[in-house]
A protein has these predicted regions:
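N-terminal Rossmann-like NAD(P)+-binding subdomain of aldehyde/semialdehyde dehydrogenases
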Residues: 1-113
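A glycine- and small/hydrophobic-rich beta-loop-beta segment
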Residues: 251, 259-337
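Conserved small-residue-rich beta-alpha loop and adjacent elements
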Residues: 95-163
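C-terminal core of ALDH-fold dehydrogenases
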Residues: 305, 313-440
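Conserved NAD(P)+-binding/catalytic subdomain of aldehyde/semialdehyde dehydrogenases
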Residues: 169-256
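Short internal beta-strands
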Residues: 143-153, 257-264, 270
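Short acidic-hydrophobic, aromatic-tinged amphipathic segments that line or gate anion-handling sites
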Residues: 1-4, 172-177, 299-304
Length: 441
């Protein structure tokens, strides 16, 4: 039976009505007031009154602000992420098949026309996130990719984010953050192209705006705080495990980190090491990690690796690391996670920044039914079919009978009219409303 060496504080199941009300009001204001309302919110909330649509001068200035080494690192990340996305794209196939003589059906892949990519820029400069969203959309074949990131007063968009956006292929870049940015993407403001899909992580206001707009636009996930779990057995190095937990706790004061271990000694050793690692962080990261570890961290000791799998699947963590023997066994048995990192040589930070697979992942248990951002989010998988008259003769009779069984006479008659047109001298058994067997000439 699982034993907790450390448990998170009991969750507060509060409904954030204030955030919801604020977002609803802002979306209504922007839908009515358009671009001027967006400018007003950018000015009032972010203190930014500069250009919203960024052009060549801004991109060149951002490029000049970065060292060659930084640009090379961003290019490396772009190559890995877009390369992985290209492999995903190649795994998606169109096909057609003759299901019976004269009945041909197929599957077609159609990219959405416009994607909106939100790139956060608050506590940290998320250059990698720009690549994850914009680059993946372009590999998927999206014609219009509109990217947006918060601008700071007198500074604008972080140059690393701006450079990454342009490098990844953004067709238009907006200096906007928060609800006003999401609204601009959804309503097509400053671009003339209303987004079909909006992706990218953000704060609770961004997440709520995406939730409200879902249906009008497609979204990736309603992102919550970043989560990370580590599964470790007695062979794991407690120093490495502790470093990885702290590294993810710095995301924010409400970012859960969980250790699932089959070794009590390892769990106790990790708990002992974490405080010193947190204390050594820079101020902003230290404050976030301190709160996250204190309030949201858990350390669970399991009797077996099978129980560890069960506990992990219940967490359904956004990120899941495994530092244990027989990595292939874990790969085969684990089911619920956003992205899996196998072995000590592999850490979440690699995936967060540059190794290839996307870092925009499901949170709050959504990994039970959803995966991370991929090219598939930007591609509609649609079907088509074509029948000749011989196939229509067979299918039409059965469709008419099923339609009448269901009480849908209008549906049935669309088959009737074709059968009588193509085969006027034949009689067919086309069913009766609510039953079978009647013959209609």
């Amino acid at each position: 039976m699982a034993e907790y060496l450390k448990q998170a504080n009991p969750p507060v199941q509060a409904i954030d009505t204030a955030t919801a009300a604020t977002v609803q009001q802002m979306l209504a204001d922007i839908q009515q007031g358009g671009e001027e309302a967006v400018r007003r919110y950018a000015r009032d909330l972010d203190g930014y009154s500069g250009d919203i649509v960024l052009g060549t001068d801004a991109f060149l200035q951002a490029e000049r602000a970065l060292s060659d080494g930084v640009k090379q690192d961003i290019q490396y990340a772009r190559d890995r992420v877009c390369g992985f996305a290209q492999l995903q794209r190649e795994s998606l196939l169109e096909f057609q098949s003759e299901l019976r003589p004269g009945l041909i059906a197929g599957q077609k892949l159609i990219p959405v026309s416009t994607a909106g990519c939100y790139v956060p820029g608050g506590r940290y400069a998320h250059a990698a996130s720009a690549i994850m969203s914009v680059g993946t959309a372009k590999v998927a074949g999206v014609d219009n990719v509109v990217a947006t990131s918060p601008a700071r007063p007198e500074v604008g968009v972080n140059p690393a984010i701006l450079y990454a956006m342009k490098l990844a292929g953004a067709d238009r870049v907006l200096a906007l953050g928060g609800v006003q940015a999401v609204a601009a993407l959804a309503y097509g403001l400053f671009s003339g192209h209303a987004a079909d899909v909006i992706v990218g992580p953000g704060n609770r206001f961004v997440a709520e705006a995406k939730r409200v707009l879902f249906g009008r636009v497609g979204i990736d996930v309603i992102a919550g705080p970043t989560e990370s779990a580590v599964i470790a057995d007695e062979t794991a190095d407690p120093d490495v495990v502790a470093a990885d937990l702290v590294g993810q706790a710095e995301h924010g004061p409400d970012s859960p980190v969980w250790l699932i271990t089959t070794s009590r000694a390892l769990g106790e050793a990790v708990i002992a090491r974490v405080p010193a690692l947190i204390e050594a962080l820079p101020d902003v990261a230290r404050a976030a990690a301190t709160a996250a570890w204190r309030d949201y961290a858990e350390v669970v000791v399991c009797d077996s690796r099978e129980e560890a799998v069960q506990v992990s699947d219940e967490y359904a963590s956004e990120h899941l690391q495994v530092m244990a023997e027989d990595l292939d066994w874990w790969l085969a048995h684990l089911r619920n996670y956003g992205s899996l990192f196998l072995g000590e040589e592999t850490t979440v930070a690699y995936g967060d920044k540059c190794s290839g697979p996307n870092h925009i992942l499901p949170t709050k248990g959504a990994a039970r039914y959803s995966g991370g951002l991929s090219v598939g989010k930007f591609i509609k998988t649609v079907t088509w079919q074509r029948l000749d008259r011989s196939a229509s003769r067979e299918v039409g009779q059965i469709a008419a009978r099923i339609s009448r069984l269901e009480g849908m006479e209008g549906h049935a008659r669309t088959g009737d009219v074709r059968l009588h047109k193509y085969y006027p001298d034949e009689a067919f058994e086309l069913g009766t409303l609510g039953g079978h067997g009647a013959q209609i000439a």
